[in-house]
Amino acid sequence: MLKYPEFLVDTSGLIKLGLLTLLLSSTLRWQKIYYEIKQIQFEERFLADEKLNSYLLDRLGPAGLETARLTFIKLCRSVSHCGIVPPFIHYESRYMVAPKYRTSTCVIYKNMSTIMTAIMCYLYDVIAYKNNIFDMIADIYPKRFCKGKNEYDTSRVLDHFRNSSSKTDLPWFQILVVREPLERFLSGFVHKCVREVGRANTCYGCGENIQCVMEKQYERLMGKAQISSIVHTIEDAHFAPQTWHCELRENFRKFTIVKYNETDTGAMLNELEGHLRNRGIGQDILKDIRSQVLRRRTFHSTHNNKKRAMFENQVRSSPYLMKLLVKMFYYDYLLFGYPLPQIQ
């Protein structure tokens, strides 16, 4: 009887080893494919909202959109857990209209809102305003002259003025004043957390601790503040993203965006005057508005405040706080055309 060498006969161990190696290799390959698919899904989440994506593409272009996507990936750990505050939460809308000139604005706290409210009141009824208000800057929000007269909480009201008397047959012109996100946050912080100390639990009890305020507000923006039935705080009103206001998911392209720059109010007024002049508003009215706006600042302005400069330096010099800032206002930066800060 023919006998084979033992190493040729007993091959079961080698076969098992080969099968195990093949199985392990296959498992690793499929695991890699799985993670690649998850990563693709994660990166595609940046473009998942078609309407938002179309707005971003309009504002940023392809190259800018790619830069924004890379920052998005840095700030989001996974598909199910993203630390960026979402845009377009239906929070609050405050429309002021001047039907005679087919002009409206939606005001956002800390974006020259007191002045824009007064300007729209002036345009709503020029004669009545001139006869009753002699200092536009003193026409402050709590006791404003047009309270309840030309103010609405939805843009749908513009449809009701379609047949009102007007100097022009032009469609409605809608203005949205926006502000650089860090500048706006600092203005709100100094106004509400440093100067205004009489309220209960002011700024979440953080006092002048800006890191504490940012952390507490971020927590609210990622949670309860997104719920429409929740009573929003004064802090929410001043610190919520600008994209949460004015029904922007549906109305973004309807607005002409004007950037507020507190260091150069005159330049902003030049732009605003150009738009208003096109609505048939006389030069005498525009000249009066400019004169009153530039005469002095509102009482809650924080421009040139020494503490504000200190807090700005604190935020800018802290990688942690700058990252937190971008997570809070990522979409404000992108949609309103402000450079996205570099984060570590």
Which residue ranges define each predicted feature?
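Membrane-interface amphipathic segments in extracytoplasmic regions
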Residues: L2-Q344
